[in-house]
């Protein structure tokens, strides 16, 4: 049976850059908040003491997040500047198309359209500076809203979002495919879709 710490760690991992609140952790795991505080402190200490771990646990704006340690910033930057990450996969393009057409949109909104979890795709697009955070939705948990950036426009040779074809609301039986088709028409992308 998995330990409480393992459960917490898995939720921190899957919540990605958005992070997770103490209330959300408590609701999902059934662990009371005082016990969660204790487990989170232990987990933070574990990462801090373990020199072989690349991660650290941070607490900001009522949310807990797993992030890479500052000492690895140059290595991460080197990877991000390599050709390996600049080519967008089908899953990344799909996520980007949804954000481009539906912005501002939450990660959960993207997940619902894609039908799969999108945390890693959103993190990747943020690292590429193609999308950015744009406030929070006034709803329980105050989820982060995402929008495209000026770099997104430059990347695809667009002058403004107005150059994206308009959605035909009457024909949107498969919203995800319509968004991808329109996005590919505009950007000239023909990459095969792939699952995250």
Swiss-Prot record:
Keywords for the protein's UniProt record, in alphabetical order: Cell cycle, Cell division, Chromosome partition, Cytoplasm
Compartment annotation: Cytoplasm
GO cellular component: cytoplasm
Highest taxon above the source species: Bacteria
Cystine connections: none
GO biological processes: cell division; chromosome separation; DNA replication
The UniProt record lists the keyword Methyltransferase: no
Pfam families reported in the protein's UniProt record: SMC_ScpB
UniProt cross-references to PANTHER family, sorted A to Z: SEGREGATION AND CONDENSATION PROTEIN B (PTHR34298:SF2)
Role, per record: Participates in chromosomal partition during cell division. May act via the formation of a condensin-like complex containing Smc and ScpA that pull DNA away from mid-cell into both cell halves.
Family, per entry: Belongs to the ScpB family.
Assembly mode: Homodimer. Homodimerization may be required to stabilize the binding of ScpA to the Smc head domains. Component of a cohesin-like complex composed of ScpA, ScpB and the Smc homodimer, in which ScpA and ScpB bind to the head domain of Smc. The presence of the three proteins is required for the association of the complex with DNA.
Name of the protein: Segregation and condensation protein B
Organism: Ligilactobacillus salivarius (strain UCC118) (Lactobacillus salivarius)
Lineage: Bacteria, Bacillati, Bacillota, Bacilli, Lactobacillales
């Amino acid at each position: 049976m998995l330990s409480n710490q393992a459960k917490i760690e898995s939720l921190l991992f899957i919540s990605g850059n958005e992070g997770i609140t103490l209330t959300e952790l408590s609701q999902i795991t059934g662990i009371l908040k005082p016990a969660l505080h204790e487990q989170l402190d232990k987990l933070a200490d574990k990462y801090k003491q373990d020199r072989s771990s690349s991660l650290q646990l941070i607490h900001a704006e009522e949310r807990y997040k797993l992030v890479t340690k500052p000492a690895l910033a140059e290595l991460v930057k080197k990877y991000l500047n390599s050709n390996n990450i600049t080519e967008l996969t089908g899953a990344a393009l799909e996520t980007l198309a949804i954000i481009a057409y539906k912005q501002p949109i939450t990660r959960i909104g993207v997940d619902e359209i894609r039908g799969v979890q999108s945390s890693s795709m959103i993190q990747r697009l943020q690292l590429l500076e193609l999308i950015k955070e744009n406030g929070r939705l006034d709803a329980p948990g105050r989820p982060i809203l995402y929008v495209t950036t000026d770099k997104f426009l430059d990347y695809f040779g667009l002058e403004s979002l107005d150059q994206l074809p308009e959605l035909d609301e009457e024909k949107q039986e498969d919203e995800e495919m319509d968004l991808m088709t329109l996005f590919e028409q505009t950007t000239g992308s023909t990459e095969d879709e792939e699952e995250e």
